[in-house]
């Protein structure tokens, strides 16, 4: 059981805290694991990372002197794509400020914490003209479904 939870923790930690520009060394990873209640050594880290790689997680290993450094590789969206989506959401007038903030929060969760800071550094939805209707997504969905129903009906 400890191995499974350590693997899940390791995958989540690498996803949230590493990217192409921010790696973590084996020793740093051991310290993080131990600080979170997991027993770890070089072999367990190596084995766990290999298991994640075998499970199709894109964990990249780089040589950092005599030690290894690890970081999460490809993600669902690349940083420029996330920037474009965040800009589109924040500048959209029909999305309320509250809904914009919630959507931007969801989009930033797809990036590392460093990339998330970059995404939110210039986003200010409060000063923009936004819709007051928080139910716009529900209304849009209902209209879309109605249009689709009309297309299916003879």
Please identify what each model-predicted range represents:
Residues 1-88:
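Short, basic/aromatic recognition patches that contact phosphate-bearing ligands
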